[in-house]
A protein has these predicted regions:
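Fungal secretory targeting signals
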Residues: 1-23
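A domain-level signal for the mature, folded cores of soluble proteins
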Residues: 20-133, 148-241
Length: 241
């Protein structure tokens, strides 16, 4: 009896240890709530907070959560009807962030998810379900008491708009605008304009099920810039000379 019990427990433990991460659900885009702010501690966390951007939505959707801590992901919105239809809620915003040393500098990527990318109201060419946009802030050293801002890059379709002197508040918080030049879809630019900060969720503090959901979900024509597969390629493109 004892042998049988031990064998059963061992089998259960082995199965649990080897079990893959459970696939979670695709849920309505407005059913997800922003995760409470969660960033790493220490000097790197301080730098992430110091250079937190302000985002202004000049056109299109407000930012929404893309995923939760159970691995459920947003189903997004069809790119039809009003360009802001179903995605006007200003209380849903979430900023995703990842930081790390790269090529002798420190990079912080701040990213936002929008349920659809629709350059104009109606059924127009160029729109699509899901949109991911981001900026990269380049510092000399996040472990310094006062890191130096070396430049920044804003996502622009498949590339970046780069600058050594992005518009900022207090010299550290980049001012970022989400906009479109019809008929092209949305992109980001650095611009002096009103903006908001949103709760930040750091890649370093996310559970594995959330990281897995971000990495394995089919986001259509959009892609998550800060997952492992995209992190360094994006930083290469976003480099500021």
């Amino acid at each position: 009896m004892l042998f049988h019990t031990l064998t059963t427990l061992l089998a259960v433990a082995t199965c649990a240890a080897g079990a893959p991460l459970e696939k979670r659900a695709v849920v309505p885009h407005d059913s997800l709530s922003p995760h409470a702010e969660s960033i790493r501690t220490g000097a790197e966390g301080t730098a992430i907070k110091t250079f937190e951007p302000y985002l202004h939505i000049a056109h299109g959707c407000q930012p929404y959560p893309a995923v939760d801590d159970q691995g459920n992901v947003s189903g997004g919105l069809q790119d039809s009807g009003s360009s802001t239809g179903g995605c006007r809620d200003e209380t849903k915003g979430q900023t995703y962030v990842r930081g790390g040393a790269y090529r002798g500098r420190y990079a912080i990527m701040y990213a936002w998810y929008m349920p659809k990318d629709q350059p104009n109201s109606g059924n127009v060419a160029g729109g699509h379900r899901h949109d991911w946009e981001h900026i990269v802030v380049w510092l000399d050293d996040a472990n310094k008491a006062n890191p130096t801002l070396l430049g920044a890059a804003a996502s622009s379709h498949s590339g970046y708009t780069t600058t050594k002197t992005p518009q900022t508040i207090d010299g550290t918080h980049p001012q970022v605008e989400y906009f479109t030049n019809f008929p092209t879809d949305h992109e980001l630019q650095f611009k002096t304009s009103p903006g908001k900060e949103y709760p930040m969720w750091d890649w370093a503090t996310m559970p594995d099920v959330t990281k897995n959901a971000l990495a394995t979900t089919n986001w259509g024509k959009a892609n998550v810039p800060f997952i492992d597969a995209n992190w360094e390629p994006k930083l290469d493109k976003a480099w500021v000379e």
